[in-house]
């Protein structure tokens, strides 16, 4: 998860608006490791937490994004799909044997994750074909 997470952050930084938001509103310059840890905790909670924990956390994140004007659906989708792409790609490159149907299932299951951060389900890819077009 660590390698996939770092890859996701690097891919997310390729979007000028995402990087602009991070530069303007994140403390990553002063506390890079702390910021990385908090991001890891966020992903871990959404992956392994209870529904109550995930809803509480994502509600907080949505409120922060809204307050800062960082709730653009296109941008949120970019960040989400960079994470999905990174975790899947890292797993495959590490030698995990994941059938195409299982890859599609993972991408489809991540729609719930996207909805929790405020992305409309209809906007989120549910398979490899959709993943390739974001």
Model-derived regions, located:
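Mature, function-bearing regions of proteins
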Residues: 1-131
């Amino acid at each position: 998860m660590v390698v996939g997470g770092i890859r996701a952050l690097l891919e997310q930084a390729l979007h000028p608006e995402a990087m602009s938001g991070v530069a303007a509103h994140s403390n990553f310059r002063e506390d890079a490791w702390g910021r990385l840890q908090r991001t890891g905790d966020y992903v871990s909670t959404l992956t392994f937490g209870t529904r109550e924990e995930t809803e509480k956390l994502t509600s907080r994140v949505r409120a922060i994004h809204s307050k800062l004007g960082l709730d653009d659906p296109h941008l949120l989708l970019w960040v989400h799909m960079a994470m999905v792409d990174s975790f899947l790609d890292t797993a495959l490159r590490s030698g995990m044997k994941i059938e195409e149907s299982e890859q599609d299932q993972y991408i489809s299951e991540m729609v719930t994750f996207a909805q929790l951060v405020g992305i409309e389900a209809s906007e989120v890819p549910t398979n490899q074909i959709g993943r390739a077009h974001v």
